[in-house]
């Protein structure tokens, strides 16, 4: 089995030792560039980085990075970069799905930003995958940058948990590239859970949780917190769950999104504002069967808009304590009944 593993993978510990307390950034970068079209495996242990490690997007030189469950890439205290620990496709930008090697991935392990670094970014390439990763103490957990194909990045992210650094600028996932799929994710310790500055994205079973800690412990910062901030258009949300953020879902007037089976709740009333959906401009999306649990008689809204006469629709909302709603704007866009539990 030992020899089989070395046939299947480039074993990092044959070249770079973990748990030394020393910077291994340059050694890992050299290992990546010297092993094109290989899967590079990181056994358990801590690997300290003073700067990002970058993989090529060119399919003939691309690599996949696979970490054991308890292998950890951690930013050193001396980290000064405004980038991620791992930058997929950054070493050699490329745009192709035709050349073998275009589909590469990052899988497993732990990325620890040490409160300074971002977790992982997709800088170039097509159809890059990130999965089964634990991302901790980051300013931005995952950053999908402008895609190589006319801004389309086509990334696939699933089974990832993210805990941010509790700053008022922290973001779980930032999407600038189009046409990505995010599924089965848990996010906490951030000010914004998911920020989509692009379109054509599919979001399913995502659960951002707001935690009162660090800069986010201040109520004045809570008021600008958003679980799902959409600044793009034509995005699809299915079974997405906002937990305690001041605003669960925000969108622009240009947004033509579909929200299905959203779940929204607040576990405390300490900050006094509960917004389920907020349109910056007119409301032009479709919301189907949202489940909303308002906590108490605070300033509550199922929908707020900054401009009237939108063409959006809210279908069959299920609301716990509908009597707590103080902004009745949603009635102008309501289709079907409001479903409330009998008391």
Question: Where is each model-derived feature located?
Answer:
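Right-handed parallel beta-helix/beta-solenoid
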Residues: 1-30
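Short glycine/acidic-rich loop motifs that flank beta-strands on beta-rich extracellular proteins
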Residues: 50-52, 74-82, 114-120, 138-144, ...
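Surface-exposed loop/turn motifs in large extracellular/passenger domains
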Residues: 57-64, 87-107, 122-132, 146-160, ...
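Beta-strand-rich extracellular passenger or scaffold domains
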Residues: 40, 47-50, 72-75, 86-87, ...
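Acidic, glycine- and Ser/Thr-rich low-complexity intrinsically disordered tracts
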Residues: 310-311, 315-343
């Amino acid at each position: 089995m030992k020899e089989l593993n070395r046939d299947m993978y480039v074993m990092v510990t044959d070249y770079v030792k973990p748990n030394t307390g020393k910077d291994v950034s340059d050694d890992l970068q050299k290992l990546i560039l010297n092993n094109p079209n290989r899967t590079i495996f990181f056994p358990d242990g801590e690997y300290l980085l003073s700067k990002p490690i970058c993989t090529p997007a060119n399919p003939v030189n691309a690599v996949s990075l696979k970490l054991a469950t308890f292998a950890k890439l951690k930013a050193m205290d001396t980290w000064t970069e405004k980038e991620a620990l791992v930058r997929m496709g950054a070493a050699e930008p490329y745009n192709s799905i035709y050349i073998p090697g275009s589909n590469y991935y990052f899988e497993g392990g732990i990325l620890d930003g040490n409160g300074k670094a971002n977790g992982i970014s997709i800088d170039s390439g097509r159809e890059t995958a990130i999965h089964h990763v634990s991302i901790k103490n980051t300013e931005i957990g995952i950053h999908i940058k402008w895609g190589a194909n006319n801004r389309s990045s086509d990334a696939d992210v699933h089974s990832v948990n993210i805990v941010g650094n509790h700053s008022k600028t922290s973001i779980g996932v930032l999407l600038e590239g189009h046409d990505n799929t995010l599924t089965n994710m848990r996010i906490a310790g951030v000010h914004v859970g998911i920020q989509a500055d692009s379109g054509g994205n599919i979001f399913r079973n995502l659960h951002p949780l707001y935690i009162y800690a660090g800069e986010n412990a201040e109520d004045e910062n809570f008021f600008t917190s958003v679980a799902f901030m959409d600044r793009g258009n034509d995005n699809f949300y299915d079974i997405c769950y906002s937990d305690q953020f001041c605003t669960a879902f925000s969108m622009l007037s240009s947004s033509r999104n579909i929200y299905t089976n959203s779940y929204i709740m607040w576990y405390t009333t300490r900050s006094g504002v509960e917004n389920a959906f907020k349109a910056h401009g007119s409301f032009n999306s479709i919301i189907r069967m949202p489940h909303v649990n308002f906590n108490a008689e605070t300033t509550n809204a199922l929908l707020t808009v900054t401009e009237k006469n939108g063409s959006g629709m809210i279908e069959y909302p299920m609301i716990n304590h509908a009597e707590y709603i103080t902004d009745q704007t949603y009635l102008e866009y309501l289709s079907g009944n409001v479903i409330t539990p009998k008391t």
